[in-house]
Each structure stands twice: as C-alpha cells, then as structure tokens.
C-alpha cells in the first residue's frame, strides 16, 4: 500500500528486521536496560513489524448488523514492554476491504482508524474486543478499529514494583499510535486519520493524547519502552466526561458545588464543619486560575449577554461572565431536550415562555444535580483517592498532587513531582511549542454528571476553540457520568471530518 506523505518524512524504513530493531533500541535505552537488570531478568524484545498473516477470520451478527472481519489480536506495540497483559492492541478490519470492495466512501487505504480505549478510574485496561458495541458498530461503518490496552495506577510487576503510575497510561497510548504510523504502509486504514475515543479517565486520556502530539516531555518514556520512532499526534478526539485537569479539579468542583452540603454517592451524607470550611477555601482559589486562562466566548454563540470574544472571567466571589457562560450552555442543553419532546414542566427552576427556555436558576440546578464528592474531591487529604494513587511512584502507592492538600494533609503524604502532574493535564500543552494538537474535537459532558465540575470540560473546550481548533462541545441533558450513548451522532461526526 502506497501513501503520499505531506510535510513529513518517514523516520524509519519499513521492513527492518527484529535484529536491527534490537540494536537501535539497545543503543538508545540504557536507562531501561539498567531497570531490566535490576529486575533480574531480561524481557523478550518484540518486533515492531506488523504481521499481516497473523489473524483469524470471524463473523459477528448483532441486530441488523452482520460484520465479517479479520481479527489481529494481542499485538504488542512496543519492542520492550513492561507488561504484555496491557501493552497490547486489538486490530479489526472489515473483510470486505480484502475483497476489493468499498464501504460507504472508504477503501482499505482511506478508512479512518477508530481508536477506543476502555480505561476507567485510571485503572489498567485491556484492549476492547469485537463484543464492545462501539467496536462492531465502527466496523459496520467501514472504519478500521485499533483498540489499545494500557497500564494503569494499580499495575505492578513480579517484584511488586508499581509500573503504571502517571504518566504510564498516556505513554502507552502514544506508543500504540506510533506502532500504527510505523506500519501504515502495510496495515489497512489511514494512520493520518486516527480518531481516539474514551470515557471518564479514558476520555481524559484521549484529550491528553490529542493535546500532546509529539511533545518532547514524553520522549524518554517512549524510548525506554522501545516505541517506534514515529510521530504520535492524532487526527481527532472524542472525549466523554473527561476526568482531567486534575491539579485544578478540586477548586473547580467547589466553585460549582460550594453551598451544597449533602452528598450522594456510595453513601449519603452531610459535609462536616471542617469540610464546609475546606469547600469555601477551595472555591475562593478558582477565579484566579480561571482568569489566568484568558478564555473568551467562542464564535457562533448566540446570547443577549455574551457576545463573541467576550472575556470569560470571575470575580473574587466566583461570579462573572464565565458563570453566565456555564448557564448559557445549560440553557441550550435544556432547549435541545425540550425541542425533542422532553417534559421539563416539573423543574420549577427552569423558565419556559412560548416554547423557549428563557432562564435557569443555576444554584437550584446544582442542588438538583446534587454533590457527589466531599472536599477535596480529587486530592484527598488522607491521600486515598484514585487520583492520589495515580500519582504514586514505583515504590510509593499514593501521593498528593496539589499544594493545598499537601499542606492540609491528615497523613504523612508526599507531593508528586511536578513533571508527571504536568504531563497528565492537557491544558498545559494546548499552546505549547513543539506540540501538534488534534484539529478536530468532540467533547460531551452530561448535565447531571457530578464526577467532576462542569467547568472542567468547558475550560478545555473553550481553550481549544480559542486557539482555532474545530470543537464540537455539548452538554447532553439529564445524562450522568457515561459515554458512547450517542454513537450514531459520533459516527456521523467522524464521517464528516474524515471526508475532508
């Protein structure tokens, strides 16, 4: 398969032998070699060459969809993996392409590559299989599917050493992208049209993947794994309810939920006096961060209050144009639901006149959505949250990752190093030099999703839009913390951007 590469040169000649790969890798990976020596065993070195004959031909029938496909499964995507249970990828191709047929407007060379991950809670994740609804429906659309696995916060090796702490998961996803680009001439699909998809922590990692393309911060980690010497930027991002911007998530959460003192999650409860005080302290820290982003109202916003390019700011009390923008987005969401026939008459905090949603009481809406987490929501003072666990080290399970929680810690907790914290936040890279950002973004966050503050995806989407990226952002009405609930719309978006 031939490809025309524009403005890019191939970094590596296709078809090199495994021996050559080993030589190149050993010359550039002294740190990883030392680490392997310490583990007292030499891991197998894997070829980065795609084996196009190592597949099974399968057929799946679900509902109206019958898909005949080739399954290339458990492909190790780095030459020197730390954990072959997770650093693997499943690759699925519609058999019709091998029969010389096209599907819709796609051929074996032009089909976009759907790149879904199954990561949740920053846990390790196996690659998605054909049983995953998004995978088999993507195949039915004519996409090629490359589903990567990745290490996570609880991954350990045989000696009990932590191997999946930050930034392991994003490094693994980048390595999988590099494998696809490395083998683009022999693998079906177009590696210049990779569309990543994920939910929750998986959505955060798709956003991070899209925002950090080719940034040098990740290079030492990729080199140590023996990742292909290729670019790792991607074409597009589909991110559902991303649990991202973790080092600012606590202050954003309390800006939204401060004053809501009851919470509902695994147990129902009421905030203590100390927690209420912490909530107030965190809330007051948010305006300074928000204002530092210098966000502006994106184009195509139709509001009597907010005009295009109006600065989105907050005063010391947490009020201002950014809050009005959040309100506008919620109002638009409610209007879409109302237009589709949803009965909103029981919601007394919504004002409806002449079939138009004219006002939403934001404070009453937040009470309706309810608080889920106690403050701090992410960097827990006892250092026991999933996110504390994410920012551990090889030998330390949990660490703080904000100065506030470190200074107010109820345990003898250490503070994570600055670089891993930076590397897990896409907001740090959107305007960074030497970084290739995905051009197309689709971000969804349900209106009653309480796992993180609504401010988090709004800031991400707005920062991207302000930098002239193509952003499709929406807040689906009455949707909680979930993803892939609108696959038909997602695939329509993919088809539209892939046609250009």
Predicted regions, residues:
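Non-catalytic, alpha-helical, charged scaffold/linker segments
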Residues: 240-244, 248-370
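Cap/lid segment of the alpha/beta-hydrolase catalytic domain
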Residues: 116-171, 210-212, 479
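A domain-start/cap signature at the N-terminus of enzymes
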Residues: 32-103
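Primarily recognizes the serine-hydrolase "nucleophile elbow" in alpha/beta-hydrolase
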Residues: 182-260, 421
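C-terminal subdomain of alpha/beta-hydrolase-fold enzymes, centered on the catalytic histidine
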Residues: 330-500
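Short beta-strand element of the alpha/beta-hydrolase
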Residues: 89, 103-120
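Alpha/beta-hydrolase active-site loop
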Residues: 163-186
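Sec-dependent signal peptide cleavage junction
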Residues: 23-33
């Amino acid at each position: 398969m031939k490809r025309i590469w524009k403005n890019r040169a191939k970094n590596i000649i296709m078809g090199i032998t495994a021996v050559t790969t080993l030589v190149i890798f050993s010359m550039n990976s002294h740190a990883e070699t030392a680490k392997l020596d310490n583990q007292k065993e030499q891991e197998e070195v894997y070829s980065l060459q795609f084996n196009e004959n190592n597949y099974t031909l399968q057929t799946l029938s679900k509902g109206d969809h019958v898909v005949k496909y080739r399954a290339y499964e458990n492909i190790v995507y780095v030459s020197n993996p730390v954990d072959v249970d997770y650093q693997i990828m499943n690759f699925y191709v519609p058999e019709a392409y091998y029969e010389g047929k096209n599907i819709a407007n796609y051929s074996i060379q032009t089909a976009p590559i759907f790149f879904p991950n199954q990561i949740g809670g920053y846990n390790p994740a196996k690659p998605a299989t054909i049983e995953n609804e998004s995978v088999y429906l993507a195949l039915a659309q004519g996409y090629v599917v490359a589903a990567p696995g990745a290490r996570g916060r609880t991954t350990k090796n045989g000696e009990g050493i932590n191997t999946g702490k930050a930034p392991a998961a994003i490094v693994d996803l980048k390595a999988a992208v590099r494998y696809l680009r490395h083998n683009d001439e022999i693998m079906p699909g177009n590696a210049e049209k990779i569309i990543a998809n994920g939910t929750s922590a998986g959505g955060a990692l798709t956003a991070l993947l899209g925002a950090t393309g080719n940034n040098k911060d990740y290079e030492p980690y990729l080199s140590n794994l023996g990742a292909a010497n290729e670019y790792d930027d991607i074409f597009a991002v589909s991110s559902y309810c991303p649990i991202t911007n973790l080092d600012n998530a606590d202050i954003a959460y309390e800006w939204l939920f401060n004053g809501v003192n009851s919470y509902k999650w695994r147990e129902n409860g009421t905030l203590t006096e100390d927690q209420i005080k912490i909530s107030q302290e965190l809330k007051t820290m948010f305006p300074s961060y928000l204002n530092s982003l210098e966000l502006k109202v994106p184009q195509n916003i139709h509001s009597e209050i907010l005009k295009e390019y109006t600065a989105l700011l907050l005063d010391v009390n947490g009020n201002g144009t950014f809050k009005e923008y959040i309100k506008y987005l919620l109002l638009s969401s409610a209007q879409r639901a109302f237009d589709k026939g949803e009965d909103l008459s029981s919601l007394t905090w919504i004002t409806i006149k002449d079939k138009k949603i004219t006002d939403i009481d934001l404070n009453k809406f937040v009470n309706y959505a309810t608080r889920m987490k106690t403050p701090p929501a992410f960097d827990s003072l006892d250092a026991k949250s999933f996110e504390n666990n994410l920012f551990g080290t090889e030998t330390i399970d949990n660490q703080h990752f904000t100065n506030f929680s470190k200074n107010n810690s109820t345990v003898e907790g250490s503070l994570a190093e600055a670089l891993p914290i930076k590397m897990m936040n896409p907001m740090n890279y959107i305007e960074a030099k030497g970084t290739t950002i995905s051009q197309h973004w689709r971000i969804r966050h349900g209106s009653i999703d309480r796992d993180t503050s609504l401010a988090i995806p709004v800031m991400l989407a707005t920062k991207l839009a302000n930098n002239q990226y193509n952003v499709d952002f929406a807040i689906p009405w009455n949707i909680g913390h979930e993803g892939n609930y609108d696959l038909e719309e997602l695939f329509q978006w993919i088809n539209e951007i892939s046609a250009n």
